[in-house]
Amino acid sequence: MNQLEKYKELLLKWNKTHNLVSKSQARNLDEHIEDSLSVSDLLGPEVLDLGSGGGFPGIALAIKNPTKKFYLVESNEKKSAFLLNTSNQLELKNVKVYNKRIEELLPERFPNNLEIITRAFGSAAKTIKSSEHFL
């Protein structure tokens, strides 16, 4: 079983108790993975995924880009536990999970060339306001 298939299996298993994705998202995981991977060629070497939730786009991108480093930020403890467990199960050495709000993170602890991505975190205004200390 490849890593993306294993990721989908873990996501569906954990979703039963952790509400990681909606029922409609669970039925269309391939579509959400494909959507997440659509930015793959545009990313630099260091990426912060804001509001990682069930791992879209961070986990999917980390699987397809093993030479890039991904910092997954998720304030929900259950979702963070899923992200940490999944990155360990998939042996994703390029993933670091932070169970914090973005406002709590110190930019100086991250690379200067860090790129920020997000999917369903909130409006553009909310995303910019929450992460402005990284910009």
Each model region followed by its residue ranges:
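Acidic active-site catalytic centers that drive phospho-/nucleotidyl reactions
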Residues: 35, 49, 74
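Conserved SAM-binding loop of SAM-dependent methyltransferases across substrates and taxa
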Residues: 54-67
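Residue-level preference for alpha-helix termini and adjacent loops
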Residues: 19-20, 55, 120
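S-adenosylmethionine
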Residues: 67-71, 75-135
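Class I SAM-dependent transferase core
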Residues: 2-45, 78-95
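Conserved class I S-adenosyl-L-methionine
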Residues: 44-53
